[in-house]
């Protein structure tokens, strides 16, 4: 009797195995659809169809796996010995048919309000949202991503079974013991593969991509000739050692003549000193060069000395630097130190301790030299940090009193990552009744937090006047850098329970696992938001400086004059 080509025994074993990867468990499909629908709910920032498809696929795959686990456990614990299980073939057919019909229909229908939700979030950011027809493409991406993840997991399960069968044949082990050992072996191999190959390979590729960029020079930027700048012919830090961001920092900004026109009185040439990765072999050597640069440029005779730990790439926000220089009419010195050329999020994953060690070393080196000066001949000592630079700066202080003890006049930390040690400690110990998004600590005497709504927001939540050192955190309610944490996987944070901030959707909630991946996706889009939203603080930084480090006699009108110059840089140069 001939064998039909459609019968399973006529197929090649590899084809049978490959086809088995596509066969789905119906309980898993139901949970996968549920988690996909939950992933469509709004988060901190707008998501286009591609990002939503990625997040939807990841969450659908997790939901599928959870559903399979629940279904299998329920069968083994409750149903295997039940008299009424399994139901009749007819009932089982209609149960499966219902899942097949309802799951995809629910996913498609949920995309319609999801597009509307994204338009609402986009409106909060001041940008245009997606169209509903265009957003339907989300389902295609999610299906592909989900299928790949589920298939990958099934391959791992098959690998465990293969190892278990080998152990049973070779050592005659009990099934459960063989499965346990097989799982341990596959997990160990998987961890080795991920940590030893994939992760290291990712960082190696990131380094290979970023290093040439760091060796380049920004378009339109040339070596400074003024001795007040690192990289100049008179500098101890050669131009070609400063890195991409360092060269941009020392070669840009307003000069004395432009500041004089802006402020209507003679200005000083701002001092900008910087050390790149190639300026010296290590951080201590680079710090020594910077202290030498500060002495060479007579930076300690200026009105303000600003220490600015950089972000991962070595970037110092030009708004932070220029606004302070405008406020003090050039009577300033700014010092920065590069510790990496990788983007901040990669530096954070690769070695966040490196940024903290570098920041601590920079602050200690400059502070030690500053402290040697007679008290009445010291400049105002000011600290600034944005994003990973904020985390680097906080590493220099075990607790808040250390900031005052070291003699800092003002500290401005912008968009601190959630793992920042001092920020987290202050949030945990905030005054009773204040929220995580708008916290208050010690009635705002030394440290304050602002959403950067307007210039007056810094004082709005304070219950007492400033006392001594002024420390200010700027944190947008929509900034995922501030709010992302692994804790989002299984814990609802206070900021998602309390009243929302000004630019966070009222529709955002918390769902286990789902919210974690949503906010993770928001991280990739955080800096592309308009100023005042996400991780783009723009001219909000000026309001921060006006709050913590205003020159004598500074007024709200002066702040607006500088703001106009920041918004129209050409006006000061004309």
Regions found by a protein language model. Give the residues of each.
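C-terminal His-loop and adjacent cap/lid subdomain of alpha/beta-hydrolase
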Residues: 14-379, 399-574
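Short, Lys/Arg-rich, polar N-terminal cytosolic tail immediately upstream
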Residues: 1-20
């Amino acid at each position: 009797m001939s064998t039909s080509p459609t019968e399973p025994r006529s197929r090649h074993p590899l084809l049978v195995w490959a086809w088995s990867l596509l066969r789905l468990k119906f309980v898993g499909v139901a949970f996968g659809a549920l988690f996909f629908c939950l992933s469509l709910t709004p988060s901190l920032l707008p998501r286009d169809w591609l990002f939503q498809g990625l997040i939807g696929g990841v969450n659908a795959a997790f939901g599928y796996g959870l559903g399979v686990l629940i279904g299998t456990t329920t069968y083994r614990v409750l149903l295997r010995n039940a008299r009424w299980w399994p139901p009749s073939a007819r009932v089982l057919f209609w149960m499966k048919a219902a899942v097949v019909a309802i799951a995809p229909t629910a996913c498609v229908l949920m995309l319609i309000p999801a597009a509307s939700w994204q338009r609402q979030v986009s409106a909060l950011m001041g940008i245009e949202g997606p169209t509903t027809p265009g957003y339907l493409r989300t389902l295609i991406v999610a299906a592909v991503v989900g299928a790949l993840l589920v298939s990958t997991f099934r391959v791992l399960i098959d690998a465990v079974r293969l190892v278990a069968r080998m152990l049973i044949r070779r050592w005659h082990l009990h099934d459960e013991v063989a499965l346990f050992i097989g799982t341990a072996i596959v997990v160990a191999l998987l961890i080795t593969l991920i940590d030893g190959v994939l992760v290291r390979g990712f960082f190696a590729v990131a380094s290979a991509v970023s290093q040439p960029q760091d060796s380049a020079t920004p378009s339109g930027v040339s070596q400074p000739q003024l001795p007040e700048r690192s990289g100049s012919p008179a500098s101890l830090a050669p131009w070609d050692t400063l890195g991409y961001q360092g060269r941009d920092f020392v070669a840009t900004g307003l000069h004395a003549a432009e500041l004089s026109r802006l402020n209507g009185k003679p200005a000083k040439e701002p001092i900008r000193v910087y050390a790149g990765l190639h300026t010296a072999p290590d951080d201590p050597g680079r710090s020594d060069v910077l202290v030498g640069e500060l002495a060479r440029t007579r930076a300690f005779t200026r009105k303000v000395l600003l220490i600015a730990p950089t972000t991962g790439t070595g970037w110092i926000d030009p708004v932070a630097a220029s606004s302070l220089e405008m406020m003090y009419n050039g009577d300033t010195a700014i010092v920065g130190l590069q510790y990496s050329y990788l983007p901040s999020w990669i530096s954070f994953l690769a070695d966040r301790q490196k940024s903290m060690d570098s920041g601590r070393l920079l602050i200690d080196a400059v502070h030690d030299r500053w402290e040697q000066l007679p008290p009445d001949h010291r400049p105002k000592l000011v600290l600034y940090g944005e994003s990973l630079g904020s985390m680097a700066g906080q590493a220099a202080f075990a607790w808040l009193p250390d900031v005052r003890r070291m003699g800092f006049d003002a500290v401005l930390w912008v968009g601190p990552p959630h793992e920042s040690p001092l920020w987290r400690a202050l949030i945990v110990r905030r005054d009773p009744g204040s929220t995580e998004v708008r916290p208050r600590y010690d009635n705002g005497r030394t440290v304050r937090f602002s959403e950067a709504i307007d210039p007056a927001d810094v004082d709005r939540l304070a219950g007492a006047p400033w006392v001594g050192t002024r420390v200010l955190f700027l944190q947008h309610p929509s900034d995922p850098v501030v709010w992302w944490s692994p804790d989002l996987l299984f814990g609802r944070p206070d900021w998602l329970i309390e009243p929302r901030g000004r630019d966070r959707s009222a529709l955002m909630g918390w769902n286990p696992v789902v919210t974690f991946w949503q906010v993770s996706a928001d991280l990739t889009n955080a800096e592309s938001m308009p100023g005042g939203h996400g991780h783009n603080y723009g001219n909000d930084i000026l309001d921060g400086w006006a709050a913590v480090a205003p020159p004598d006699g500074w007024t709200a009108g002066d702040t607006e004059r500088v703001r106009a110059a920041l918004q129209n840089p050409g006006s000061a140069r004309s």
